[in-house]
Structure formats: C-alpha cells, structure tokens
Amino acid sequence: MPTLEMPVAAVLDSTVGSSEALPDFTSDRYKDAYSRINAIVIEGEQEAHDNYIAIGTLLPDHVEELKRLAKMEMRHKKGFTACGKNLGVEADMDFAREFFAPLRDNFQTALGQGKTPTCLLIQALLIEAFAISAYHTYIPVSDPFARKITEGVVKDEYTHLNYGEAWLKANLESCREELLEANRENLPLIRRMLDQVAGDAAVLQMDKEDLIEDFLIAYQESLTEIGFNTREITRMAAAALVS
C-alpha cells in the first residue's frame, strides 16, 4: 500500500493496469506537464478550503459543517503535494494561482455582495464537478501512489457536491434567477480552464473530451437534483459553448 513517504522509485512498481497503457512517469515531458497539473489540484484544494471558510461568514448556522468540509480539502492538498514529491516534481504554483484567478475573482465579488447562491454554485457545484471529472479521468492513467490518493479524494468531493446541492435545492425558489445568472457568468470560465489545461492533460493521457463530458454529466446531475427542469438545464449547459 502506498504511503506518503514512498520514494520516487515506487512509481515503477505498478500492479494496476498495463505498462503499455500508462505514460512514462519518469520522462521529462511527463514531469513538465505534471508540474502544472499537480499545481492545479493543489491550488484547487486550497481555494476550496478558503471558499468554504468564506461561505461560513454568509451561513453562520452552517459554520461547523463548512469547517469540516474545509478541513477535508486541506487533507487533499497534503495528499496531492505528496504525489508531486513522489515523482520528484515541483508544482508550478504561480501557474495554478493564475489559472484559478478568474473564478477566484468572481467568487470574491459574489462574497462581497453577500450572494450565497452564487458562491455555492462556483465552489460547491462548478469547482467540485470540475475536480470530480479531472480525478475520474486521471485515475486510470495515474501512477500507483497518486491513484491511491486520488481514489480517496474523489469520494470526499461527492460529499462537498452534495452539500451545495442540498442547500440550493432548499432555497431554489428564492435564488433561481441568481443561479441562472451565475451560471452564465461562470460556466464559460470552466470551459476555458478545461481548454487551457488540455495540452498538459494529454501528456498525462487524460482526454479532453472525456474531461468535458464527465464535467457536464456531473454538473447537469447536480442541477437536476437541485430542481431545475430539463429545458432550464439544457439552456444552462449551453453556456459552456461560449468561448
């Protein structure tokens, strides 16, 4: 079983999948791409932590639950940091912070305006669905150490997605129009983020179309659970086509 102290050589001892189907985890090309992909997931977990703590200022009755979610995100961050160290890769955190800047700015604007539904749509739906799609696509082509970490993380991300769904479902009638507007403003950002990372993801053998498909499936399932009808969801998903 992988441990956080497992050395670089551990990635060569895969018992999962065929070596012919997996990328060369030791190549310079792989490590270069991984430095950005790994940074994105590390920064994404940090952003999620900060966002859940911030949402707690808008939902004081939910502070303890949001702190619990935030604490989980920090565990994820530590795990993904260990994944980079296991491969001997330094994460490109400057790239990752810039990568998340548009969504971060929109979240902070909504937070300042007290728009709880928008904050939840950005963090608990869009970002969580983005993460889930990325992790699902990554797991089959990951090194054994990262596979174990990522499989544990993705289970937690569904808990976070479900939290956002439950609150928005309970408050849908009062925030429907705000959510429609937030979707129009933020879903195109997710599509651009997926496009931006496609080249590096391909080096890791993560297919761009699989990423987009998995994301849209997870996001549309959340919108259905919240209570949007098929027509509304179709129109909301169309925002992803805006470049």
UniProtKB/Swiss-Prot annotation:
- Keywords from the UniProt entry: Iron, Lyase, Metal-binding, NADP
What Enzyme Commission number(s) does the record list for this chain? 4.1.99.5
- Organism domain of life: Bacteria
InterPro entries reported for this sequence: Ald_deCOase, Ferritin-like, Ferritin-like_SF
Q: A Gene Ontology molecular-function term? A: aldehyde oxygenase (deformylating) activity
Q: How is the cofactor bound?
A: Binds 2 metal cations per subunit. The catalytic dinuclear metal-binding site could be either a di-iron or a manganese-iron cofactor.
Which parts of the sequence bind Fe cation 2?
A: E73, E128, H160
Task: Tell whether NADP is among the UniProt keywords.
Answer: yes
Q: Write out the residues that bind Fe cation 1.
A: E45, E73, H76
Per its record, the protein catalyses:
a long-chain fatty aldehyde + 2 NADPH + O2 + H(+) = a long-chain alkane + formate + 2 NADP(+) + H2O
Function of the protein: Catalyzes the decarbonylation of fatty aldehydes to alkanes. Requires the presence of ferredoxin, ferredoxin reductase and NADPH for in vitro decarbonylase activity. Involved in the biosynthesis of alkanes, mainly heptadecane and pentadecane.
What protein family is recorded? Belongs to the aldehyde decarbonylase family.
HAMAP family attached here? Aldeh_decarbonylase (MF_00931)
Record-given protein name:
Aldehyde decarbonylase
Q: Which organism is it from?
A: Prochlorococcus marinus (strain MIT 9313)
